[in-house]
Amino acid sequence: AHSKHRLMCEVVAEEYGTAVSDRMIPIFMQSGDSRYDNADKMILKGADVLPHGLINNVDTKLGRHGEKLLDYVGWLRDRILKLRVMETYQPVLHLDVYGTIGILFGNEHFAAMADYLEKLAEAAKPFHLRIEGPMDADERERQMADMRLLREEVDRRGIPVELVADEWCNTLEDVKYFADNKAGHMLQIKTPDLGGIQNTAEAVLYCREKGIGAYQGGTCNETDRSAQVCVHVAMATRADQILAKPGMGVDEGHMIVYNEMRRILALRGRRA
C-alpha cells in the first residue's frame, strides 16, 4: 500500500475485485463484566451493536431458569429507550452466551432453546436481537449440526432473533463449512485463528456469497495496529459488523476502530 501511495483497504479491494465501502461498517462494542456501566457508555456513544455482555456462567449470569439474562435484556431495552438522544437510534442487541443456553436446556433440545430465545426476543423489542454461541457441542461436526438445527427451528417459528456461530468456527475452512450448511444466521470471523489477513478477507467474502452474515471479530487482546488493519479488511470486503478492539473498556476499542474508519472515509472523500 505504501509503495503505491494507496490505502490498505484499496489494495485489498483491488486484489479481490471489490469496492471499498463508502460508509461506516457497524461497530460492535463489548462490555466485559461491567455490563451495566459499560452499556450506558455504549448507548451514550451511539453504539451500532451492543453490549456483548460476557454471559459465560449459568448460575451468575444466565440464571438457572434463564431469568438473569432475561432481566438484563429487559433492563438494556429500557436503558436505551431512556438514554438515547434520538428516537431513530435503533442499535442491535448482540449477546455472547458462551454455550450457556445449551448447558441449561440441553444442546439438542432445540424446541426448549427456541422457546427461551423467543422470550429474549420479546424482551428486546423494539430492538433486533442476536445471540452468539447458544451452545457448545465440544466438537466441530456436532456444533455445526446443532447450530443448523436450532437455526431451522427459529426460522420455522418466525422468531425474530439471529444466531451467531462462534465456537468451533475458527479457521477459513471452518467458516466455509458452517456457511455451506447455514449453521447460523451470522458467523464470527476470528482474526487470530485464521492466520494471514487474506484468510479474513476471503472468509468475509465467502459468507457474503452464501448469504450469511459476516461479523469480523477477533479478541480484546489484540494490538491497536492489528485492529486498524482489520478495519481496512472490513471496509474492503464490506463486512456486516466489526468488533471494537482491543480492550474491554469500551472507549479504547471504539476509538481505535471508529477513528480508522473515519480516516479511510475522509482520505477517500478528499480524492473524490
Q: Where are the language model's segments positioned?
A:
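Expand to "…catalyze enediolate/carbanion chemistry for C-C bond making/breaking, isomerization
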Residues: 272
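N-terminal capping/lid subdomain adjacent to the active-site entrance of alpha/beta enzymes
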Residues: 1-125
